[in-house]
């Protein structure tokens, strides 16, 4: 089964009685090069443990599982659980966590599942949780890198240079903890259903040391929020 083939996707979803939820920001990839290139950009290999958020029906999940030592995917939509059980049945290094990633203890999750592996995060993120989720992820300092497909406008904000129109508090936060780069853009025609916006993939290696030393990060972020 080709998880990026429109006909195969529709047959799979019909078999499971699945309908897209706009509230959950569900847009499934229908171009095979996109998950392949995202997985490649993540740097996943046999020494890597990958946390994926919102696997959908599993096209990126499969690409990651072919490369990584272990893939743990967190999915909120219970309607997709039997779908993923079918599409990921041939990958013993895959684990599905049923629930809301915003309620997960990321440090505990990494400790439980990725012992001896280099932890990274790679995902096609639902647009509606991008900012709060990435904030939690980078502040947790649990991951060696973060590679995500997100709305292009948000990607540009994350990668913006100081003093530009796109630069803001979220830019500063992401650049304090990581060194983000925009890797490639993904047109809306690569999704089912097609969103109204262009998307982009960013790769964010974690910084070993922050670019500036501060006495109190809590005070830093209070000042940043006041300044922006």
Task: Please tell me what each predicted stretch does.
Residues 1-226:
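Catalytic cores of RNA-modifying enzymes
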